[in-house]
Regions:
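Conserved ABC transporter NBD signature motif
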Residues: 69-77, 85
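Conserved catalytic motifs of ABC-family nucleotide-binding domains
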Residues: 163
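ABC transporter nucleotide-binding domain
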Residues: 186-279
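Conserved ABC ATPase signature
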Residues: 142-146
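Conserved ABC ATPase "signature" region
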Residues: 109, 113, 120-138
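Catalytic Walker B motif of ABC-type/P-loop ATPase nucleotide-binding domains
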Residues: 167-170
């Protein structure tokens, strides 16, 4: 992918990233990362804590210089047009960064003035955002008195005041309850329907399932990039000659120990009251049940299972952990 050439001919692409590298002294935080984000997409950027997600966002928004590689955001080179990039995008940080001692209305007005919005446009935008984000009942409430979910709605509203077509959201639902998370995602889908592009970092797999495109970064390296459906079909996730099954049991710890010692089971992970296991497809499920029962492990059900995104990322993580350990040996 050649950014300078391609970006001129593919106007529907909001972000190009090519061979991004970021080093801090001897430590490489981002190592040869390339991807693209199409306009109107909700692009999920996943990875464990410390994997480089926030560093990539800071590089793409011009807040952190690139050590190597190149990137364009909304058609602008982040190396040479960082200020213009920041004028065209919205950014919502991982932590609530608005003013606790200002009301909802005062926060919106303050950030609108930071964006130098004319008074008439600011009034219009505040009215639109209050209606869209449901902030009307809270206009006179101090930000400090809002629940986590409403704080995030306010932060999103402030990031949208200048009508950006691209929004970077760094773990926007961290620390808020499941209902508020779902409501915030419903709002993102509504905004996406109006042509707004979202670059969202998250470590919630149910949120990743809702993205139109997903990339997974692990210790600075991009190890998966595609639609949720295409990632489920990766050979690394379910190689030929294997079957993924769910073993439902009240004794998940013992069942996991059994699975990891069984030569016919390639991998196994606990998911609630069940085990997700990748087995050789010649392994008869009735025989598997009998082996578990012989070990004194009660089994409620064993059934074939389509891989979830969580299965995908667990398998990819195991593989790359093994590669890292082998390279250090």
């Amino acid at each position: 992918m050649n950014i300078s050439a391609t970006s001129q001919s593919v106007p529907e692409v909001a972000i190009f990233a090519e061979h991004l590298v970021r080093r801090f002294g001897e430590f490489t935080a981002v190592n040869d990362v390339s991807f693209e984000v199409k306009k109107g997409e909700i692009f999920g950027f996943l990875g464990p804590n410390g994997s480089g997600k926030t560093t990539v966002i800071k590089m793409l928004t011009g807040l952190l210089p690139l050590t190597g590689g190149a990137a364009q955001v909304e058609g602008l080179d982040v190396r040479t047009h960082a200020e213009e990039v920041r004028e065209r995008i919205g950014y919502m940080s991982q932590k609530f960064s608005l003013y606790d001692d200002l009301t909802v209305s005062e926060n919106l007005t303050f950030y609108g003035r930071i964006y130098s919005l004319p008074a008439d446009r600011l009034k219009r935008r505040i009215s639109e955002i209050v209606e869209l984000n449901g902030l009307g009942p809270y206009l006179d409430r101090l930000a400090a008195k809002l629940s986590g979910g409403w704080k995030q709605r306010l932060a999103l509203g402030c990031a949208m005041l200048h009508e950006p077509k691209l929004l970077f959201l760094d773990e926007p639902t961290a620390g808020i309850d499941p209902v508020a998370r779902r409501q915030l995602w419903d709002l993102l889908f509504e905004l996406s329907g109006h042509g707004i592009t979202f670059f969202v970092t998250t470590h919630y797999m149910d949120e990743a399932e809702r993205c139109s495109h997903v990339a997974y970064i692990y210790y600075g390296k991009l190890i998966a990039d595609g639609t949720p459906n295409s990632l489920r079909e990766l050979r690394d996730v379910q190689p030929p000659g294997t079957l993924r099954v769910e073993i439902t049991t009240p004794e998940v710890t013992r069942a996991l120990r059994f699975a990891r010692q069984n030569p016919g089971i390639r991998s196994a992970t606990i998911f609630g009251q069940s085990i997700h296991a990748l087995i050789d497809d010649h392994f008869d499920l009735h025989d598997l049940r009998e082996q578990l029962l012989k070990e004194g492990i009660a089994v409620a059900e064993i059934r074939p299972l389509a891989p979830s995104l969580e299965d995908v990322f667990v398998e990819l993580t195991y593989k790359h952990q093994a590669l890292l350990e082998a390279s250090r040996a």
